[in-house]
């Protein structure tokens, strides 16, 4: 059975750590912007109902992209924090006809290497879940907790530690309520699952590929370009 879904992509950040002349989602790989590659995986999916990209009000790059004229993709104003942008996206979806019980996927604009199999697994595993969940990867490396002097204070048990990735998938109404409540309470929200966690809801972890990397630093971009060169050679 198919699982219909909406998409929100917060894309108002400037990506300062990339030290580039434009936000990282507009850097090019293979002749196209990162955000175009990011959206491809979702726009190719037959169960997508529509998408909202949350952008800086004065964003000069988005209108130049072909995807900006796709009728399935709407634009919403991004906020100061990620949670503000996602809320604006949810409001835009409701204005477009989305219901409170509809599934919404939130995905990072600079995470363009999402495998279609991972997207499909997420949708299948969470289709009947009472809360929702997210793609994640079990931590593989040894973790150290540091003291104030930058010395090892403790080795952390990694057996139950996962890295949170995106997409993250929740019901529209529940996610909106959780984000609004957490923001009103001044709770730091780093991803959508943390907002649900603050509300006492436990999100399901769905294991995905480790190469679903978020492009944050120059070395991430170099890795992505090389990985796609190797991928294209094998086709």
Swiss-Prot record:
CDD domains: CDP-ME_synthetase. It holds the Pfam family IspD. It catalyses: 2-C-methyl-D-erythritol 4-phosphate + CTP + H(+) = 4-CDP-2-C-methyl-D-erythritol + diphosphate. One of its GO terms (biological process) is isopentenyl diphosphate biosynthetic process, methylerythritol 4-phosphate pathway. The record marks 158, 214 as: Positions MEP for the nucleophilic attack. Signal peptide: none annotated. The keyword Nucleotidyltransferase applies. The record marks 17, 24 as: Transition state stabilizer. It is an enzyme of class 2 (transferase). PROSITE patterns: ISPD. One of its GO terms (molecular function) is 2-C-methyl-D-erythritol 4-phosphate cytidylyltransferase activity. Its EC number is 2.7.7.60. Keywords: Isoprene biosynthesis, Nucleotidyltransferase, Transferase. InterPro entries: IspD, IspD/TarI, IspD/TarI_cytidylyltransf_bact, ISPD_synthase_CS, Nucleotide-diphossugar_trans. Pathway: Isoprenoid biosynthesis; isopentenyl diphosphate biosynthesis via DXP pathway; isopentenyl diphosphate from 1-deoxy-D-xylulose 5-phosphate: step 2/6. Belongs to the IspD/TarI cytidylyltransferase family. IspD subfamily. Catalyzes the formation of 4-diphosphocytidyl-2-C-methyl-D-erythritol from CTP and 2-C-methyl-D-erythritol 4-phosphate (MEP). PANTHER family: 2-C-METHYL-D-ERYTHRITOL 4-PHOSPHATE CYTIDYLYLTRANSFERASE, CHLOROPLASTIC (PTHR32125:SF4). This is 2-C-methyl-D-erythritol 4-phosphate cytidylyltransferase.
């Amino acid at each position: 059975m198919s699982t219909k879904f909406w998409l929100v992509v917060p894309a108002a950040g400037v990506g300062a750590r990339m030290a580039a002349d434009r936000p990282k989602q507009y850097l090019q790989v293979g002749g196209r912007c990162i955000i175009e590659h990011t959206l491809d995986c979702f726009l190719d999916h037959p169960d997508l109902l529509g998408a909202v990209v949350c952008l800086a009000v004065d964003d000069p790059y988005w209108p130049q992209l072909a995807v900006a004229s796709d009728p399935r993709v709407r634009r919403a104003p991004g906020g100061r924090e990620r949670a503000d942008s996602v809320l604006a996206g949810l409001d835009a979806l409701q204005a477009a006809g989305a219901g409170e019980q509809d599934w919404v996927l939130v995905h990072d604009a600079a995470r363009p290497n999402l495998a279609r199999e991972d997207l499909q697994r997420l949708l299948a595993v969470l289709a009947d879940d009472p809360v929702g969940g997210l793609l994640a990867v079990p931590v593989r490396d040894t973790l150290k907790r540091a003291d104030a002097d930058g010395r090892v204070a403790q080795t952390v048990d990694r057996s139950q530690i996962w890295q949170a990735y995106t997409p993250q998938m929740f019901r529209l109404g529940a996610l909106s309520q959780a984000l609004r409540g957490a923001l009103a309470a001044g709770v730091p929200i780093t991803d959508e699952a943390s907002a649900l966690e603050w509300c006492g809801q436990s999100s399901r972890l769905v294991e995905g590929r480790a190469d679903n990397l978020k492009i944050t630093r120059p070395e991430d971009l170099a890795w992505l370009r090389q990985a796609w060169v190797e991928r294209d050679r094998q086709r």
